[in-house]
């Protein structure tokens, strides 16, 4: 990838959420002279899925999320996906530590707080699963220090609200690791964008992209409209990153690149229950994840969480999944229909045919009564009072429907994926899970995909290792490097660590 002074900007970031902010931050660290421009359709950064109350704020390290550790037919548990997510979060920790050390982020407490991560289950079958899961995870250095208990008294010390009022005859089990975190990704986005703005970022709010065109010279021309007065402008760029959350699929389609053919989006909405009562929130300090219902999407795993947003501690429970045809929380009900094309209609229909259990689950969630929703909370918090809780709408999650290779059908993917132009001059990030926690790892993937020629010893590599000391090291297999990374980042970020 080479840049030209013929363009208005070197790098154009579409969307002002955590993904664009992280990629922009990393690019600036590697080459401060790069001209960066960011376009955002709303009037501030981080207002969609990055905003504090639009996501769970879990520093997803696959400590407690049971959907990352499926059980095999023989009863053993596969932790390979969990290890991948776990070490991807280490990359985020290293980048944040670098930003704190260099003064770009003055205080990590502005967005990050230590918070134990727990898994909690009930019933003989689920207890057996959690015990097998703990045995597999605790044996690996990445999960050193993870505790397991079936003792109600011990679990009550870890999470008193979960145990008070619970049937003493109920078979229960929990795991706990103290190295977990609660992250306000909205606050982090503001910190990153503010840092980039100080460094020269051309930031344009109220700017909605309406066209993305590539010229014969390979230069991209992006047309955007002022959402306040309706005026239109154009900007040329050598490299375009589409990090617009749920809207990324539509923007990718506007680019016209052949690689986008067949891709579609499947939106899933969510609702939280939120408690701002100080006396209640003060008695729960953990993120407690349970087991998802059969057929439910990964982001629907129920959990009772400590949240710290704007300096205030609250509790969150959910999410309750739902369906909306919007691709963004502040989007349009026509988003899904407008994204249907001749190339993706067959993959969409194929996915609809093959995912009856998911569709049945979502329909059930949509028509679920408030009483039923609250009873679900009481499975985690038996003595919860209805008056203490209010509903809050989560950000939209748009899952990937991708074409089958050599087949007109499609498949539903619960994850994230980069779709890049053949010349690597444009790339879009699709998908939703695990999302913000792996933003730094995704940014590194963008570098490897689109800027491989610059990742050399006389190019960006020295600066990249300065920002991410573990770059090029497999923390899953290198226990010593993993321990060293976590010890160093825990100290800088003021979070808990367990020495190996």
Swiss-Prot record:
Pathway: Carbohydrate metabolism; tricarboxylic acid cycle; oxaloacetate from (S)-malate (quinone route): step 1/1
Single biological process term from Gene Ontology: tricarboxylic acid cycle
GO molecular function terms attached to this record: 2-hydroxyglutarate dehydrogenase activity; L-malate dehydrogenase (quinone) activity
Keyword Cell wall biogenesis/degradation: no
Domain of life: Bacteria
Pfam families in UniProt: Mqo
Keywords: FAD, Flavoprotein, Oxidoreductase, Tricarboxylic acid cycle
Cofactors, names only: FAD
Name this polypeptide is given: Probable malate:quinone oxidoreductase
Gene name tied to this protein: mqo
């Amino acid at each position: 990838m080479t840049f030209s002074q013929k363009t208005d900007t070197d790098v154009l970031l579409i969307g002002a959420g955590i993904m664009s902010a992280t990629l922009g931050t990393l690019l600036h660290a590697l080459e401060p002279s790069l001209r960066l421009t960011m376009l955002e359709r709303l009037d501030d950064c981080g207002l969609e899925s990055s905003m504090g109350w639009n996501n769970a704020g879990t520093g997803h390290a696959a400590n407690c999320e049971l959907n990352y550790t499926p059980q095999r037919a023989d009863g053993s548990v596969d932790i390979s996906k969990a290890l991948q997510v776990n070490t991807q979060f280490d990359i985020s920790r290293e980048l944040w530590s670098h930003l704190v050390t260099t003064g770009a982020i003055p205080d990590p407490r502005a967005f990050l707080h230590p918070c134990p991560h727990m898994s909690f289950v009930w019933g003989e079958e689920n207890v057996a699963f959690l015990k097998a899961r703990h045995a597999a995870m605790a044996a690996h250095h990445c999960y050193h220090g993870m505790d397991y208990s079936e003792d109600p008294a011990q679990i009550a010390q870890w999470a008193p609200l979960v145990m008070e009022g619970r049937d003493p005859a109920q078979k229960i089990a929990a795991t706990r690791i103290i190295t977990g975190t609660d992250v306000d990704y909205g606050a982090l986005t503001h910190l990153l964008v503010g840092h980039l703005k100080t460094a020269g970022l051309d930031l344009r709010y109220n700017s909605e992209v309406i066209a993305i065109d590539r010229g014969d010279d390979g230069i991209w021309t992006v047309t955007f409209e002022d959402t306040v007065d309706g005026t239109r402008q154009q900007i040329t760029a050598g490299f375009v990153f589409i990090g617009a959350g749920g809207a990324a699929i539509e923007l990718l389609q506007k680019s016209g690149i052949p690689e986008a053919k067949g891709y579609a989006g499947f939106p899933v909405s969510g609702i939280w229950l939120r408690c701002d009562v100080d006396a209640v929130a003060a008695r729960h300090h953990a993120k407690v994840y349970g087991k998802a219902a059969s057929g439910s999407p990964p982001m629907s795993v129920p959990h009772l969480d400590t949240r710290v947003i704007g300096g205030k501690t609250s509790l969150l429970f959910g999410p309750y999944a739902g369906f909306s045809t919007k691709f963004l929380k502040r989007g349009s009900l026509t988003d899904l229909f407008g994204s249907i094309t001749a190339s993706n209609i067959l993959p969409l229909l194929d996915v609809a045919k093959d995912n009856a259990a998911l569709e049945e689950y979502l329909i059930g969630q949509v028509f679920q009564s408030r009483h039923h929703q609250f009873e679900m909370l009481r499975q985690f918090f038996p003595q919860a009072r209805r008056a203490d809780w209010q509903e809050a709408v989560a950000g939209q999650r748009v899952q990937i429907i991708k074409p089958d290779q050599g087949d007109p059908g499609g498949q539903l993917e619960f994850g994230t994926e980069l779709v890049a132009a053949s010349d690597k001059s444009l790339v879009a990030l699709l998908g939703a899970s695990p999302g913000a926690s792996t933003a730094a790892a995704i940014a590194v993937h963008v570098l490897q995909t689109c800027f491989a020629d610059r990742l050399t010893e006389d190019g960006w590599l020295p600066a990249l290792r300065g920002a991410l000391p573990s770059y090029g090291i497999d923390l899953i297999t290198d226990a010593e490097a993993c321990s060293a990374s976590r010890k160093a980042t825990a100290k800088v970020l003021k979070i808990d660590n367990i020495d190996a």
